[in-house]
């Protein structure tokens, strides 16, 4: 029996409707964006088709509909969503199609190799992962972790200072994830911070010593 749920961190799942055998319509939760992240169980060996329905054409378009340039021959392929069997290693679906109809729909299908799978719009970066990263670097002598204040939902908005002189006048300021569609920029900034504090690059060390 196939089961859907959104009972985990970072999840977003609306109403699920079974249209036919191994064919499901997924309603997205109403919000100002288009975040999608849910779990499916009981899917090993089954080819399942998913129809994601959006509340507006704008949301469907933001999945990356391509413009063929020819209104008589539109290209309805779109940005492929991701799936993961462990919530850590992610893969694109082979194909996805978007249908600008009523309701606005993005459809994709896949034959799964494991019983449990996570499906999302793009690779997630969770708040608990952020806290784990900050905890790992907080005691490094070149790192200072502070809070700029709370977010609208009460979480800390962290700022990480890297260098021997936190009060230096000349600074480089990096911002990541200005909106919810940029979680991979968090990973890029993690890599940059790790490189800065690794102490394995003479040029980086010299730059930090000059700050």
Q: Which residues make up each language-model segment?
A:
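Structured catalytic-domain cores with a bias toward divalent-metal coordination
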Residues: 1-211
């Amino acid at each position: 029996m196939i089961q859907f749920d959104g009972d985990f961190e970072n999840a977003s799942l609306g109403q699920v409707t079974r249209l036919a055998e191994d064919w499901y319509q997924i309603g997205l939760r109403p919000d100002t964006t288009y975040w999608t992240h849910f779990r499916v169980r009981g899917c090993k060996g089954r080819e399942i088709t998913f129809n994601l329905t959006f509340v507006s054409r704008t949301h469907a378009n933001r999945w990356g509909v391509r413009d063929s340039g020819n209104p008589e021959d539109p290209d309805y392929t779109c940005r492929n969503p991701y799936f993961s069997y462990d919530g850590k290693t992610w893969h694109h679906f082979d194909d996805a199609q978007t249908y600008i109809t009523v309701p606005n729909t993005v459809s994709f299908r896949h034959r799964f190799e494991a019983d449990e799978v996570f499906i999302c719009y793009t690779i997630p970066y969770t708040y608990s992962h952020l806290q784990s990263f900050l905890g790992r670097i907080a005691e490094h002598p070149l790192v200072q972790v502070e809070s700029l204040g709370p977010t609208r939902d009460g979480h800390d908005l962290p700022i990480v200072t890297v260098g021997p002189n936190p009060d230096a006048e000349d600074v480089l300021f990096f911002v990541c994830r200005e909106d919810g569609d940029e979680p991979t920029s968090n990973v890029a900034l993690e890599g940059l911070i790790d490189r800065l504090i690794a102490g394995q690059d003479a040029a980086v060390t010299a730059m930090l010593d000059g700050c």
